């Protein structure tokens, strides 16, 4: 699996939540949210909330859901990807016009990844993850959204975050990340700037308290 060129660094802080177990095997985090600790040294992941799409003994892959990709919007991206030739050719439903383009991570930043609700599915292209959330990374879903036949809820990210085998587990043990159950309202919500605090609140943690405790084992 492709991984970021630099590993997220972390310091000592509160222990992460319990991971999901698969029978008697290892615990993996598919379908959960990673929440960066305040001591995260890698600016690419500072205050990031990452939805884990795949996690196994071979590594992990996730999408940052709270980092805008600059000022680019969905219609502009459709033109850049040559899905349409001119902006005036785009006729988007309201939910697509307001869809945020996010910076999903430092790997394959020129490629688009769409997290979306399970009411849309492309055979051999859509990956069901957990709790009605799926991942599709083909231009077909962008065309469907642009034409009003796409999923009800979606976010589009450029790039993804990747970890080598055992890397994510080590970072969690080093207290670089907290994790919690995901929910669609948080992932697909428009309040990008509030997602980090909302994720901490799911664990019953006040952001200010966490910052004060960071660095104290």
Swiss-Prot record:
Annotated spans, Disordered: 1-24
One Gene Ontology cellular component annotation held by this UniProt entry: cytosol
Annotated organism of origin: Rhodopseudomonas palustris (strain ATCC BAA-98 / CGA009)
Entry-linked Pfam families: DUF179
InterPro entries assigned: AlgH-like
Full protein name: UPF0301 protein RPA0913
Family the entry assigns: Belongs to the UPF0301 (AlgH) family.
Compositionally biased region (Low complexity): 10-20
Domain of life: Bacteria
Coiled coil: none
